[in-house]
């Protein structure tokens, strides 16, 4: 069921020509009329060795889970006729070889991700991440978009609503705008960060581990 929801979401991820966003008092509803055929989509699996990102109490790392999601989404999108550009395709971050310290590698890595997005001529950029907080009860997807980016807001709204309607019907979150994350500030095409759940929630961790 979990991966079926991802299939339904990303196979109808974005449409340039048939996209309506309707705002009500408390909800934003997006509808997409066309599939992803002939679209170019950057899928960014956040983090990567040596930066593992968040880690569950059982040792599941954000970097590993992000890549797993990215590869599955790549396969589904390509089967639907999209062209997918991955920022990374293995466990390693994409820092320059002359980076020595962890800080240098993380800075180089994020700069290279931005460069890939801005040189890709892609339609959209989707950055995949996972949450972790001390409390275990919190769960669910959350999407983010660049402040002052109407197209980014449309993208984030489409993803959030599709995920809510398909696999998390009790999730009432709406997309949030942020302006303090480097990648979302500097990627010039429509971009959304998708936090795909909580590694601190045991049930969501098991869903992420499932094939």
Each PLM stretch: what is its role?
Residues 1-211:
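Catalytic-site microenvironment of enzymes
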């Amino acid at each position: 069921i979990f991966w079926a929801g991802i299939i339904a979401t990303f196979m109808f991820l974005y449409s340039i020509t048939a996209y309506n966003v309707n705002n009500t008092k408390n909800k934003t509803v997006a509808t997409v009329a066309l599939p992803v055929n002939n679209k170019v989509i950057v899928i960014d699996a956040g983090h990567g060795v040596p930066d593992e990102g968040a880690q569950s109490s059982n040792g599941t790392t954000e970097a590993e889970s992000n890549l797993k999601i990215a590869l599955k989404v790549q396969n589904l999108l390509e089967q639907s006729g999209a062209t997918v550009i991955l920022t990374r395709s293995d466990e390693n971050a994409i820092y320059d070889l002359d980076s020595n310290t962890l800080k240098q590698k993380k800075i180089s890595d994020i700069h290279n991700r931005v460069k890939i997005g801005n040189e890709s001529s892609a339609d959209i950029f989707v950055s995949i991440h996972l949450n972790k907080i001390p409390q275990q009860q919190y769960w669910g997807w959350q999407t983010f978009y660049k402040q002052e980016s109407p197209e980014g807001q449309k993208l984030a709204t489409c993803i959030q609503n599709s995920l809510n309607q398909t696999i998390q019907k009790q999730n009432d979150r709406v997309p949030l705008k942020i302006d303090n994350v480097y990648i979302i500030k500097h990627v010039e095409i429509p971009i959304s960060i998708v936090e795909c759940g909580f590694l601190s929630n045991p049930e969501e961790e098991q869903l992420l581990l499932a094939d």
